[in-house]
């Protein structure tokens, strides 16, 4: 379970302020006080009755037998008195724990104050266009670190007080030495059973599920604690297949992500590689939008930093399709331009070529264009600063679509290259919002995945944070199945390794899991290559494949995902070649469907470096 010393103040303060508080402990103390009073009264009454019978004026008990009975009754009176003292001690220690809690709560930072600090930090970062907020950002972070330290110090004090109170409690079985000798065997049996049950409860890890390694998990196959979900490696995740902590979603690698398939920290979105992104498919940090490659971009498909608009290449551009720095407008190539389709620097106008020009130079400043506002060459469309584009607002080259800062994309808002789809900052993907490379699917930040929401590599399925899995929500590696936190399992909910079945926290002996596999380190069915290793799924040959019936080249690794691929590093269905993503492509380094040649995107293209369709 995650220790409080590594948890941020949002978690520690929230638990202390929004939990049950000291009320239940004070109620327990009152109950122990009541029990102590009742036991004390019973002990006093029992002693008075016994002494009255034995030594009263009437001498109700006489003879040797009566004397023996008086002697036998004395330990019971002593037991009642000792039990009353133990109950009173428990009440005192319960009050001490409640007092320690109240002292810690008073020393904790109010969650409202923590939230205000984080909100101010985000606002400062988003508005830090020219770096003017750097001192304020540093001050906010310093204050946040002080909050973290204050919360940890308060929790250390609480832990010390509670531990001291627990240590002061005397075990109940030592309250009356020798009492068990006075009881018959029938009475001893329930006591022994209760003691065994108590020991069993103490050893119980309190998981609601199977195959967990850790405590307080609500789910199965987790390695860690306080997860609500299955197949997580880490703590306090709300979802499945995460590798890390405090994630709200599935298939994340990192901490505090609210979404799926992220690699990094605190991303509210999916398929991001980096931290603090509000959107999907970004590579970088603190972007508000999707498909950006860089930092602090406000829009989509930018390649650079602090751009306000889409499809820009460069920094500090306001508009779309610009290639350069500090341009205000659309389709400019250069820096400091204000307007449309200018080539050069510090121009104000439309279609100007050169530096410091003011006016209207033409529909386009480039050559061979059909359209308006193009500063590049051989474009068909509007406001393209790159070359050979069909569409608008493209700052890259050879794109079919709009808002692409990368090259040879078919789609829109792609900052990477050779993508078929939209919102991808990675390269060679088929789908949407992929931050990784050569994926066939969506929201993947890893590479060579077939599916969606994978932050690992070479998976066939979805929400896998590990590598080379066939299935879903696996945080481990080379699993065939679902919700596995361990490695090389065939089945589900396994926190251990090399299991064939469900819900095991153990590591089994053997080279492979599953059925009919040869080689080493394989899971699934019928992976029959004697020299193969690291395969998951069904009927694969080679190394590192996931999915169904993939074949790597002889004596070389495969690392394919999907179905019936031949070659290496392919993702999708029936591809033949290398680094292909999609369906039925042949050649190398292409994405899409039924392309032949190399470095193509789209569908039904034959050649080199083509985007679009039927070219």
Swiss-Prot record:
BP GO annotations: response to host immune response
UniProt cross-references to Pfam families, sorted A to Z: Pentapeptide_2 (PF01469), PPE (PF00823)
Recorded family membership: Belongs to the mycobacterial PPE family.
Protein name, per record: Uncharacterized PPE family protein PPE40
Organism: Mycobacterium tuberculosis (strain CDC 1551 / Oshkosh)
Gene behind this protein: PPE40
């Amino acid at each position: 379970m995650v220790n409080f010393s590594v948890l941020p103040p949002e978690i520690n303060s929230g638990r202390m302020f929004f939990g049950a508080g000291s009320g239940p402990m004070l109620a327990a103390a009152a109950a122990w006080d009541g029990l102590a009073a009742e036991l004390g009264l019973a002990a006093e009454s029992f002693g008075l009755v016994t002494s009255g019978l034995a030594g009263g004026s009437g001498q109700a008990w006489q003879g040797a037998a009566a004397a023996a009975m008086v002697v036998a009754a004395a330990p019971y009176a002593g037991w009642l008195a000792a039990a009353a003292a133990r109950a009173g001690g428990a009440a005192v220690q319960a009050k001490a724990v409640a007092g320690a809690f109240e002292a810690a709560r008073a020393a904790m930072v109010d969650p409202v104050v923590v939230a205000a600090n984080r909100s101010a930090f985000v606002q400062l970062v988003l508005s830090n266009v020219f770096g003017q907020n750097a001192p304020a950002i540093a001050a906010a972070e310093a204050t946040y670190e002080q909050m973290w330290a204050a919360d940890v110090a308060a929790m250390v004090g609480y832990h010390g007080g509670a531990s001291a109170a627990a240590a002061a409690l005397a075990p109940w079985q030592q309250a009356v030495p020798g009492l068990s000798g006075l009881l018959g065997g029938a009475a001893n049996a329930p006591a022994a059973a209760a003691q065994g049950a108590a020991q069993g409860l103490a050893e119980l890890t309190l998981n609601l599920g199977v195959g967990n390694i850790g405590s307080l998990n609500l789910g199965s196959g987790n390695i860690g604690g306080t997860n609500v979900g299955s197949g997580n490696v880490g703590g306090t995740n709300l979802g499945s297949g995460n590798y890390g902590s405090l994630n709200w979603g599935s298939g994340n690698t990192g901490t505090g992500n609210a979404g799926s398939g992220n690699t990094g920290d605190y991303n509210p979105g999916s398929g991001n590689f980096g931290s603090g992104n509000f959107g999907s498919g970004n590579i970088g940090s603190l972007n508000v939008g999707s498909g950006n490659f860089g930092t602090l971009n406000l829009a989509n498909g930018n390649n650079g930093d602090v751009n306000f608009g889409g499809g820009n290449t460069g920094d500090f551009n306001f508009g779309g399709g610009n290639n350069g720095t500090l341009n205000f407008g659309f389709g400019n190539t250069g820096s400091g331009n204000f307007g449309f389709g200018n080539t050069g620097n510090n121009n104000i106008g439309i279609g100007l070529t050169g530096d410091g020009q003011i006016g209207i130079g033409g529909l386009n400043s480039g050559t061979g264009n059909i359209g308006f506002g193009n500063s590049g060459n051989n474009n068909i469309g509007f406001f393209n600063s790159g070359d050979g584009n069909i569409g608008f607002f493209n700052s890259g080259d050879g794109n079919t679509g709009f808002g692409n800062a990368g090259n040879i994309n078919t789609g829109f808002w792609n900052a990477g290259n050779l993508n078929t789809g939209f919102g991808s900052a990675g390269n060679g993907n088929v789908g949407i919002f992929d931050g990784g490379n050569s994926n066939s699917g969506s929201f993947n930040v890893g590479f060579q995945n077939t599916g969606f929401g994978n932050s690992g590599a070479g998976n066939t399925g979805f929400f896998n944070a590990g590598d080379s899995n066939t299935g879903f929500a696996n945080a481990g590696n080379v699993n065939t199945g679902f919700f596995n936190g361990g490695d090389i399992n065939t089945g589900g909910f396994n926190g251990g390794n090399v299991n064939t079945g469900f819900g095991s926290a153990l590591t089994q002996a053997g080279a492979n899991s599953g059925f009919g596999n040869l080689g080493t380190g394989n899971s699934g069915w019928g992976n029959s290559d004697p020299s193969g290793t690291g395969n998951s799924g069904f009927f694969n040959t080679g190394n590192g494949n996931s999915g169904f019936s993939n074949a790597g080249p002889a004596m070389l690794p495969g690392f394919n995902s999907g179905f019936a691929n031949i070659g290496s590093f392919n993702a999708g269905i029936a591809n033949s070649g290398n680094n292909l993503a999609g369906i039925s492509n042949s050649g190398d380094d292409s994405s899409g469907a039924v392309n032949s040649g190399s470095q193509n995107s789209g569908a039904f293209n034959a050649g080199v470096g083509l985007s679009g369709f039927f070219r």
